[in-house]
Amino acid sequence: MSAAAGNTAIWGRAEQQDFRSRVRGCLLGGAIGDALGAGIEFDSLDAIRKAHGQEGVTDFVSAYGRRGAVTDDTQMTLFTVDGLIRAQVRRDTGAWHPPTDVHRAYLRWAVTQRDWGPDERKTDDGWLAREEWLYSRRAPGRACLSGLGDEVMGTLDKPKNPDSKGCGAVMRSAPFGLLVGWEPQLVFQLAVECAAQTHGHPTGYLAAGAFAVISHSLARGEDLDGAVQKALVHLGTRPGHEETTDALKRALGAVRQGMPTPARVESLGQGWTAEEALSIGVYCALVAEDVRHGLLLAVNHGGDSDSTGAICGNLLGTLHGETALPPVWLVELEGRDTMLQLADDFAMEMTQGPALHGPAGSAPGWLARYPRA
């Protein structure tokens, strides 16, 4: 992607194809990691080995009545993407405040946790909120539910759940990194502001910002180690960064300590808190021999296996693109068609937005999918 006069992004065909592959990889990779961990999320490593053998899980196991089921991690990640697309569409109206659009998307997710199914009368909700399979509670985090329990948006000045540093914000924040036309400090800031809508502790929202910046670097074609170093620089400018900074440094240090093992993963924590989930996901992505190896390492530990698997999958999928993902897992993945549609819509909006909507006219089909209201 190159820049022309007026900072207009010019995308060549190969660049568009590469970007779409990374967006697909991010969403599908995260969902696969989520699904691998969904059935063992609350189990100890000993219990996992007793049930699935010494290597732990090596494939999807049944969760929520099926193989390949995803959790709230993937649900909220998809609504993050929906909110980001809506922000771009609403920009034509002169309304440009992406945190508000992402918050509205999260409120639509919250409805899926309360209602039996979509309300077809709410045409302004857009297409994603009408996907019936999303109307299922998959162990959503308490901070996410309470933070979105009313329509008041948490901000950095007045965050929701000011003491919460659970991983519920970081696990949904990879899509901010797909805003490759943005500067990294703006990506960091947007992710942080949106994280504070549910998680008000500095570690809770700064880990989300760091994850977004790491994903942003990967989406731009940079390597993972350099992406982590860049995130550390951004973290260092923020008050209250110490826990997240230390967690990322521990992940980098663990890489140099020898062969990756579940014990080494567990030395980084259990993943219930934001900084631990980020540390484990980053470590497993750094040492991954391939996507399969990295994801299985990320879920086979006693702790929040689905969230650490999702974070690792987001990273590896963004780094390598969709074609690196194991097809045997893709074919059983819940909601894959929805994810592909959403990924392609996001890539199209980022690369072809002016052709879809603007002052000169808009595609009615696009505005039906992503209403400006």
Regions found by a protein language model. Name each.
Residues M1-A373:
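Structured, active/binding-site neighborhoods that engage oxygen-rich ligands
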